[in-house]
Amino acid sequence: MSRRNKSKKRLIQKDPVHESKLVSMLTARILKSGKKGLAYKIVYEALDIINKKTSHDSLEILEKAIRNATPLVEVKSRRIGGSTYQVPMEVRAYRGTNLALRWITMFAHTRSGRSMAFRLANEIIDASNESGNTIRKREETHRMAEANKAFAHYRY
């Protein structure tokens, strides 16, 4: 184990337009090759598309989508006595939010559609309506944890 001091958690800066930490976290997930301006443009465009399609506040839809996509439990590999067990663990709030954002962006990339903003908007709308690949991934994670509930006493 490292003897150095633990690294400090970086504070997340709010985004310039919506003053939201979630939007800046989503932008960080969209970001490629340091092109933050382009990432912000994609996210803001996606939020505008959500606003037009649903006629609700896009930030509320984003928050609802992340809440729906956040897993409660996940499995982690733990090696005990020569065999590896998938041990179900509770997911902390920050990690859950990050997993939800990661899944939303990953499935937005794999979607077919015109632009990344359009695909991202559709994925967020689907997640807020509890449908789509992101929700399927969360359910799959929960099923894995449920199937390996017998190994829960190996928690660390």
Curated annotation (Swiss-Prot):
SUPFAM superfamilies: Ribosomal protein S7. Part of the 30S ribosomal subunit. One of its GO terms (biological process) is translation. This is Small ribosomal subunit protein uS7c. It comes from the Eukaryota. Pfam families: Ribosomal_S7. One of its GO terms (molecular function) is rRNA binding. It is found in: Plastid, Chloroplast. Gene3D superfamilies: Ribosomal protein S7 domain (1.10.455.10). HAMAP family: Ribosomal_uS7_B (MF_00480_B). Belongs to the universal ribosomal protein uS7 family. The keyword Ribonucleoprotein applies. Keywords: Chloroplast, Plastid, Ribonucleoprotein, Ribosomal protein, RNA-binding, rRNA-binding. GO terms for cellular component: chloroplast; small ribosomal subunit. One of the primary rRNA binding proteins, it binds directly to 16S rRNA where it nucleates assembly of the head domain of the 30S subunit. The gene is rps7. It comes from Gracilaria tenuistipitata var. liui.
